[in-house]
């Protein structure tokens, strides 16, 4: 079974022209070893839109395109797969998807956790953070700040700086191997452990070899990051 990627708004990969899609389906149908099954219709570009109203507008635009696609190719009874963590609550209500392929919800990250769930209240999508980068305080030589050993080489910053877990403190700056935490009350001491919630979970995982798995504050396993260093 093969799926055709439909460019539903990300302008990244896939086909948008129905004529080109039909030609590809026809080509697939000439082959005995593969079968056309449906469409990959994932719009990753809308998943991190912070404003709820704008995110909803973009979801509706995306799903309207997919709805037209389903109508045009209804004779093939295509399966439509898509949806992402940032917009899943809006996308599933549009009733155009047959399969939900969300993934980041399992880990979450600082940026996903900051998304407003609706336009009335300032709350977030209801998944807890499960991915943390463990850092150590290595310097407190400057008053009202602490320096930890986790910077650009430990976390991806394309979606913003990490947040500090279990402390009312703010990670404010970083370099290759150092991170600066604003610590107005000088709470942190040398060698203190600080858990950081990365701004973007996916590319952060790619920087590490192992997940250290904890349950009830006890390490129970080590999981290798099997895609470590892969760019595909």
What feature does the model see in each segment?
Residues 4:
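Catalytic-face loop-and-helix region of soluble metabolic enzyme cores
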Residues 82, 128-131, 173:
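A short catalytic or substrate-binding loop motif that flags glycine-/basic-rich loops and adjacent residues
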Residues 140-232:
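C-terminal accessory subdomain/extension
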Residues 11, 137, 219:
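Glycine-rich, flexible loop/turn motifs
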